[in-house]
Every structure is written in structure tokens, then in C-alpha cells.
């Protein structure tokens, strides 16, 4: 579901396309106890434009099902790789 959302919503930045920039951006974020996403940041970037697009698309994702610890909702950290590849 997450990958389907990303593939439909990522827009390859024009400057990156023009300069033939591609690579993998790793975005770190937290899923809160209510399923919302917070504290989105790039932990491994490629270029400012690909990094910005990765952050934008992660922030636009719908709420997740919250994680649980011992049956209780818990705040969970994720690292999500987003691959930008020119076709």
C-alpha cells in the first residue's frame, strides 16, 4: 500500500531530470499513536531537489495503522528508502 502510494504520487523534480540525477533517498519518520506521521527528515540524501520531493511525498501519505507494544498503541520510527530512477 505504501509503495503504491509513493509510485503514484512522486513527481520527479525537473532540475534532477534535466541534470540526470538519480539515486536512493532514505527518509526517517515517526508514526504516532494516532497513526499520523511526524518528524520527517532525510538521513541519506542525493540532491536537494530529490531530498525535498522525498520529504514532500512522505508528509502527504495517509495515516498509518499505529504500531503496538504489549497491545498498546506505540510511537514507532521508520526508515523508508525512496528510489529515484530515470527511465
Cite the ranges covered by each PLM segment.
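Short proline/glycine- and basic residue-enriched helix-capping loop/turn segments at helix->loop/beta transitions
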Residues: 1-27, 53-87
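Short, acidic, Ser/Thr-enriched surface-loop or helix-capping motifs
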Residues: 31-32, 37, 68
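A short acidic/small-residue loop/turn micro-motif
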Residues: 43-50
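Residue-level recognition of the GNAT/N-acetyltransferase active site
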Residues: 13, 32, 43
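Short coil/turn motifs at secondary-structure junctions
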Residues: 34, 45, 83-87
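Short loop/turn motifs enriched for small/polar and acidic residues
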Residues: 30, 45, 79
Amino acid at each position: 500500500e505504501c509503495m503504491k502510494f509513493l509510485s503514484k504520487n512522486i513527481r520527479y523534480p525537473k532540475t534532477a531530470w534535466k541534470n540526470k540525477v538519480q539515486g536512493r533517498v532514505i527518509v526517517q519518520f515517526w508514526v504516532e499513536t494516532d497513526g499520523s506521521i511526524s518528524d520527517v527528515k532525510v538521513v541519506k540524501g542525493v540532491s536537494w531537489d530529490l531530498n525535498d520531493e522525498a520529504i514532500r511525498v512522505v508528509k502527504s501519505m495517509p495515516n498509518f495503522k499505529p504500531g503496538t507494544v504489549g497491545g498498546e498503541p506505540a510511537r514507532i520510527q521508520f526508515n523508508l528508502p525512496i528510489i529515484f530512477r530515470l527511465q
